[in-house]
Amino acid sequence: MVKANGHSLTSKKGKGKVVLFFPTYEREFDNWMPFPYLYLAPFIEKAGFEVCIIDSRVEPTWEEMLKKELKDSFALGITSMSGPDLTTAMRASQIARDMDNDICLMWGGHHASALPDEVFNEDYADFVFLGPAEFTFPVVLEAVYLKKEIPSDIKGVLYKRNGKVLGSRQVNAAIFDYPEPPAYHLIDVEKYRSKNNVVAYFKTRGCPFKCTFCATGNFNVSHKLREQYRKEIRYLVEDLKFRALCFRDPTFFLKASTVMDVAELLHSIGNVRWKGQARGTFHRQYTPEQFKFMRKSGLTSVMFGVESGSQRVLDFMDKKVKRQDYLKSAKVLNDLGIEMYASFMFAIPGETIDDLKETISLMHQLKKINPNIFLQNCIFLPLPSTKMFRDAVALGYKPPTTLQGWSKRSISSKFEDRNDITWMEKSVLTEYIKIYNDEFGEYKHAAEKEKTGEYVSPMHG
């Protein structure tokens, strides 16, 4: 296993060094590895550069580490979402600016991809990468390192020159079928090992659906090659000794042949628990024999983004699923003895009190069919570049216009922590929250319930 002993890990290559910085979120650390960099780093190394990953979530002294590593680096890469993680992202950029104005700052991730001009306006970035950057980041690094012009035909890369933002705003396609394995050698894996020894894994990038609240569907879909995902899964289980896998693909169960191949692999390894995300149509995508084999192979939980119990709202979200589908999937999983983990969204733009009551009704129905179901509540968070973000704006939502503003918005699942729900009329919101609180009381997120023992994930074994 990779050990860092409190020090950052750096690959040794012949050219200059690049630091990749991962910011801190508001919610409690959930043991996710810094996946964007695990995918990007091999391509940077392949181009001959040294790579150092600093993850502020697991490094209490990340500022000192960053200053040390930047002393002999020529570029700093930063990824971020549209929320509290921007605070440490901005701080990292400022540290680099204060140390040496020649350090090239390169931003990527959902927020920079959605609102690149805001990032440039505050002088936190020299380059912004739109969408996946495995094939563009090394090209730009090479040009910066050699002090050459950026190739004019490169897509999905923006930069500022004489006060103007130049480059291509064409978002790069999602590509995941390359042979390069994730750069686990650049992190201390033990810092991401949870009590239940579970590791997250992505077999697919992108999503074929276009749910109006989600930013993932803005890109196309690409799958890891069979040989590659089998090799990587074996490495995680047999070499790194993880005993539970959480497949985080948005629609992991969509392709039955691939899922059964994964189930057969895990069954052959033995003593591995696993879970994945599914659509409501899960109940009709597999035969009874396939369902039973998945259970035998270690499937312990299936996650659903149900979102709403109102068919009107589901259609508005373009979910392409029927309310009844979730009830049927709940029955299938209950009969198999597999946990159903269902997530719901509240305070959706355009949602009515009647819609809320239909959602609560569906939750009761699901609980009756599957008594061991875990119900997760989330409050709608407008994500830039999504249709539902634009819907919220049309209904009165005034989004932040600066990185500082975005960094201060809460991603909490508690109404008392949210003061930005301006897309609902005050009188409606007041009644909405009363009905919600009467039903759920003092709501706790899954992480909070695990901490107090109110919820024990089947992934614990």
Where are these regions (language model features)?
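Flexible glycine/acidic-rich beta-alpha junction loops that bind and position SAM and/or redox cofactors
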Residues: 27-28, 116, 209, 256-257, ...
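N-terminal [4Fe-4S]-dependent radical SAM core
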Residues: 2-14, 18-19, 25-26, 154, ...
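Radical SAM [4Fe-4S] cluster-binding motif and immediate context
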Residues: 176-340, 361
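Catalytic cores of alpha/beta
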Residues: 116-122, 350-365
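A short helix->loop->beta-strand "cap" motif at the edges of active sites that frequently abuts
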Residues: 16, 98-104, 125, 272, ...
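Glycine-rich beta-alpha loop elements in corrinoid/cobalamin-binding modules
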Residues: 40-170, 381, 385
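A short, glycine/small-residue-rich beta-strand->loop->alpha-helix junction that serves as a flexible
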Residues: 25-35, 81-86
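Radical SAM enzyme core and accessory elements
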Residues: 1-21, 29, 45-46, 50, ...
